[in-house]
Amino acid sequence: MSLQPCRPAPALILAHETPAHATQIEALLTRAFGPGRFSKVSERVREFADFAPELSFCALEAGQVVGVVRMWRVSVGDQPIVFLGPLAVEETERKHGLGAQLVEHACAAAQAAGEAAVALVGDVAFFARVGFAIAPDVSMPGPVDPKRVLARTFADVPLTGAVRAA
Ligand SMILES: CC(C)(COP(=O)(O)OP(=O)(O)OC[C@H]1O[C@@H](n2cnc3c(N)ncnc32)[C@H](O)[C@@H]1OP(=O)(O)O)[C@@H](O)C(=O)NCCC(=O)NCCS
């Protein structure tokens, strides 16, 4: 049996998104979430939240966007926090840890920036792996299963109240 030379896999880079990535990110989000994407309660949050590009990242492989995580500034009650989402990884790249890596990277950036907490709407089975737990006292601007409202705190702050504009 002869061994075939193979090309080294292109390195994965986590970088802040730029306007040049916008088209690829939109296409990835449409593939990942399908047509129901804009009916999610998280979209209602993003309508009033302030995008935080310095806390948001995309994963690039050979210049192609293969993952994205976006972060937004909001408040819960009077507490300023960060809202995470959308998070998506290209289907061919899943189950290699990239989703968790993107969340960790964005959370580390938020913590380094002095943010007290990150909240999101998602599956606890996935996000518990990266430090999130159900946030029972946080309410969303629309109907949602309360078991999907999650938070990860970096400080001992009360997370009680509605998610609203920062
Ligand atoms: C969720 C997502 C970002 C994970 O990306 P990823 O790169 O595969 O993540 P990781 O490799 O870090 O983790 C994969 C593990 O999470 C599990 N997982 C993925 N989505 C999950 C979910 N919704 N609920 C529970 N577990 C989930 C996978 O089965 C896998 O489990 P395993 O390690 O036991 O095989 C990716 O599946 C995706 O883009 N999904 C579509 C968009 C989406 O649902 N985004 C999250 C919205 S809140």
Task: Specify the residue positions occupied by each region the protein language model found.
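Conserved active-site alpha-helix within GNAT-family acetyltransferase domains
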Residues: 112-116, 121-146
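Hydrophobic adenine-recognition pocket in adenosine-nucleotide-binding enzymes
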Residues: 17, 87-89
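A short beta-loop-alpha structural element at the N-terminal edge
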Residues: 12-25
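Short, low-complexity, intrinsically disordered N-terminal peptides in bacterial proteins
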Residues: 1-13
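C-terminal "cap" of GNAT-fold acetyltransferases
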Residues: 140-166
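Active-site rim helix/loop that mediates acceptor-substrate recognition in acyltransferases
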Residues: 22, 30-73
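A conserved beta-turn-beta hairpin within the catalytic core of GNAT-like acetyltransferases
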Residues: 74-84, 94
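Conserved acetyl-CoA-binding loop-helix of GNAT-fold acetyltransferases
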Residues: 89, 95-108, 120
